[in-house]
C-alpha cells in the first residue's frame, strides 16, 4: 500500500514509451482534472543519453576538475563495468516543468545532490538511486553548477587579529572601525523626537503630491501617506536630526529647502507596476534564486536592488494575500495519490507460448519469430541464453533481445548492464582499426562507434563487402561521341561537384540518333604492341647518316673508338628511350680518328 502511494516531493519513474527507458521526474503538484483524472506537475531530470556529446564532454571535464581539487581518485579504483554503470546513475536537473498523467507512474526512485565526501560506490550499491551535480537548460543547451562556491579572499573573509593579552590596550583607531549615527543621550525627549518624525512624514506626503511620477503611482492621499511613513523617510529624518546636533529648527529647514521638500523613495516606489509583475512571475518560477531572477527576468536591475525589493515586498498586503491564496490552494489540492501496480504486458514482450510470435517494438504488422533460447540469440547485455521472459530491443531489423533482468535495468537506468564493444574500444583502443588494410573490412557500425549486434555465437560479426563492377551501356558510349560539345568531359572532370545536364544530352542524342543510326560506332585507336614495333624497325632500319671525319692533329696520337649499336632487346625490357634514341643516333656507328 505504501509503495503505491505517491506524494508531492517524491521522485518517480514515468513511462512514455514501451521501448524507451523510464523518465525520472519529481512530483511538484497533484491536480485533479475536470474529467476526474489526476495529473502530476513534475520537474524534469535528464540522463546522459538525452543531451549532446559536447555537453557530456563538459560534464566529464567538470567532474575531473572537482576530483583534482578534492585530491581524491574517485574512478581509479573502479572497474570498467562499475564505471559504465556509474554513468547510468548520473542525472541533470532542469528548471523545466511538465504535466503528465499520474497513471503513467511506474515506481519510486531516489535522486540526491552529489556528495563529494561520500563514495560513489554507495550509489551503485543502492537500487533506484541517482545523483546530479549540474543543471541542464533544454532551450539554451547549457550546463550550470547547481550549488554555489565558497568565496575565498579578503573581500569575503575577515582578517582576524591576534588575541590581546590581559591588560593590553587596543591600539586600533575606533573611528575607522565604526560610525556613530545616533546618540541616545540627546537633549531632546522622546515626545519631541516623535513630533519631528510626524513633521517628516507630512513633508514626505507633500513632496509626493508635488512629484508627477509619485502622484501617478500613489493617486490617493492615503497611499501617499503610507509611502511617506516607510523606513527610508524615518531614517533620513533621524539622520538629519543627528547631523544638526538635535536642533529642531535647523533640521526642519533642511527637510524643506528652497527648491522644495525632500523626497525619499525606496525600492518599492522606484519599481514600476510591470517590473513588480515580472518579479512575482519570476519568484513563482525560480523561488528565491535571485541570480536566475535577475538573469532571465530583470537584467537591468542590480542584485542588491532585487534582494531589497523582495524583503520590502514581503511586508506588503499583496504578499499576505498571495500567501493566503496559496494556502487555500494547497488545502484544495491533492497531497497524495494511489496508483496500483501496472500489470499489463509490454508490447515488446516476446511471446513463446503456443507458438505465437511476439510484436517487435510494438509495431503493427511487424513480428519477431521466437527462437529457442538455447540455440537462438543471446541477451545483448549479459549474453545469457536462458530467461523466463524475453523482450525485443533495438531496431526491428536487428532482431536483438534482452532477458528480463537486463530489460528492467534498461528501463530504469537507460543503458545496458555490460559495456558494449564501442565503449571498450574507447577505454582501450585496438590498433587493428587503424590499419587501412583492415579498416576496409570493419563493419559500418564499429567504424561509427555504434554497438555491434551480438548474435550469441563466437563468430565475428564482421562481413566482407560485396563485390561489384560498373557496366557502361551502349547508349552511354554512343552519347560520349555524339554529344561531345555538350558533354565536355575534360571540363566536367575538373569540376567534379558540378552536376552534368543530362536532359540536354538526352535531347541532343535524340535529335542526332536518327541521322547517325546507320553509322558504326567509332572505336578508340589502340596502340600496337611493342614486339610489333621492334620487328618493324628490324625489317626497315633507319638510314645511316654520312660519316663525320675529324681533322688529324699533330700533338695528339691517332685513336679509334667504335660506337656500338644498342641492342633492341634492352629497349623492350626497359620500355624507355634515352636522349640519343629520340634524336636518331641509335643507329649511328662511326669511328672518330685524328
UniProtKB/Swiss-Prot annotation:
Tissue distribution of the protein: Expressed in germinal centers of lymphoid tissues. No expression in nonepithelial cells.
Residue ranges annotated for the SANT domain, each copy included: 266-318
Induction: By estrogen.
CC per GO annotation: cytoplasm; intracellular membrane-bounded organelle; nucleoplasm; nucleus; NuRD complex
Compartments reported by the entry: Nucleus; Cytoplasm
Keyword field contains RNA-binding: no
Domain (ELM2) ranges: 148-259
Modified residues (Phosphothreonine): 455
Self-association state and partner proteins as the record states: Component of the nucleosome remodeling and deacetylase (NuRD) repressor complex, composed of core proteins MTA1, MTA2, MTA3, RBBP4, RBBP7, HDAC1, HDAC2, MBD2, MBD3, and peripherally associated proteins CDK2AP1, CDK2AP2, GATAD2A, GATAD2B, CHD3, CHD4 and CHD5. The exact stoichiometry of the NuRD complex is unknown, and some subunits such as MBD2 and MBD3, GATAD2A and GATAD2B, and CHD3, CHD4 and CHD5 define mutually exclusive NuRD complexes. Interacts with BCL6. Interacts with NACC2. Interacts with PWWP2B.
Family listed: Belongs to the metastasis-associated protein family.
Protein name per its UniProtKB record: Metastasis-associated protein MTA3
